Amino acid sequence: MNGTEGPYFYVPMVNTTGIVRSPYEYPQYYLVSPAAYACLGAYMFFLILVGFPVNFLTLYVTIEHKKLRTPLNYILLNLAVADLFMVFGGFTTTIYTSMHGYFVLGRLGCNLEGYFATLGGEIGLWSLVVLAVERWLVVCKPISNFRFTENHAIMGLVFTWIMANACAAPPLLGWSRYIPEGMQCSCGVDYYTRAEGFNNESFVIYMFICHFCIPLVVVFFCYGRLLCAVKEAAAAQQESETTQRAEREVTRMVVILVIGFLVCWTPYASVAWYIFSNQGSEFGPLFMTIPAFFAKSSSIYNPMIYICMNKQFRHCMITTLCCGKNPFEEEEGASTTASKTEASSVSSSSVSPA
């Protein structure tokens, strides 16, 4: 094994020189330089500096503007709540631990940080799945006369929390475990060892299939069908400039959605699976640290993609920030009107993500 396994930790360095110490008790500067921990803390500070305001603003603007309190926006709010879980449950903790160079909060802190970071990420992930399914049902109409109601939205919210806890809670209950990973300043699921009594192998397989592959297939299917529906509508109304513009906008939205999903989650899932499949192989502390925190940066990607592309929300957000006035009101109003015209040619609901 090209690492050192101890009680509830795995350090990616062979202890031939005797310098490896518990990441709960000693600084891990033998893994990377103190400057690397400073960079990690600075990156977490950046994510908090951007992620907290944009997600908090999402909640505040939706509460303030009644017209935004639609069933679909319940899911978008759930996405913002998930991102705030990651900000407060993961990023703030990592700033503190990176300042010390090790996971100074101990085993209990590791369990809490791992749980809340995983929970936030999974709520966000399954919220994206619910959004994709909603768009497919409303725009493509596989079920005739389907209308996304408040009850459907509530069911979607419950579903996201059930699925998120189905992934985040088992390591607290003995099926796998949370341990410090990478630079040993944040905690995640144990992909690294086959420690007796934790059944890490079965949990990692379950997590990879049910909490990565299946969501990926669903998102690709739903947005692929959505794109086909828009193309068909545009082909049937080739003389309509607004319909052609709708096709381009939705195409761009779908591309960004899929890329955002892949950029956030594929590196982390791929590296985790590689480590799991090649246990004992040599890898450095940055090998898992970089993709792990790249996935957590979805707290910034999500609101930018799913909310800031919503013209109506953008108008309300500007109005809130500018004390009740929108200096771009004419432009935003014309854009919103055009959006509604475009959307009506494809479905009785909207094509845009809200």
Curated annotation (Swiss-Prot):
One of its GO terms (biological process) is visual perception. The chain crosses the membrane at residues 37-61, 74-96, 111-133, 153-173, 203-224, 253-274, 287-308. A lipid is attached at residues 322-323 (S-palmitoyl cysteine). It is a multi-pass membrane protein. InterPro entries: GPCR_opsins (IPR050125), GPCR_Rhodpsn (IPR000276), GPCR_Rhodpsn_7TM (IPR017452), Opsin (IPR001760), Retinal_BS (IPR027430), Rhodopsin (IPR000732), Rhodopsin_N (IPR019477). Keywords: Cell projection, Chromophore, Disulfide bond, G-protein coupled receptor, Glycoprotein, Lipoprotein, Membrane, Palmitate, Phosphoprotein, Photoreceptor protein, Receptor, Retinal protein, Sensory transduction, Transducer, Transmembrane, Transmembrane helix, Vision. GO terms for molecular function: 11-cis retinal binding; G protein-coupled photoreceptor activity. SUPFAM superfamilies: Family A G protein-coupled receptor-like. The keyword DNA repair does not apply. Pfam families: 7tm_1, Rhodopsin_N. Residues 62-73, 134-152, 225-252, 309-354 are cytoplasmic. The keyword Disulfide bond applies. Residues 1-36, 97-110, 174-202, 275-286 are extracellular. Residues 334-354 have a biased composition (Low complexity). The modification N6-(retinylidene)lysine is found at residue 296. It is found in: Membrane; Cell projection, Cilium, Photoreceptor outer segment. Belongs to the G-protein coupled receptor 1 family. Opsin subfamily. PANTHER family: OPSIN (PTHR24240). This is Rhodopsin. It comes from Gambusia affinis (Western mosquitofish).
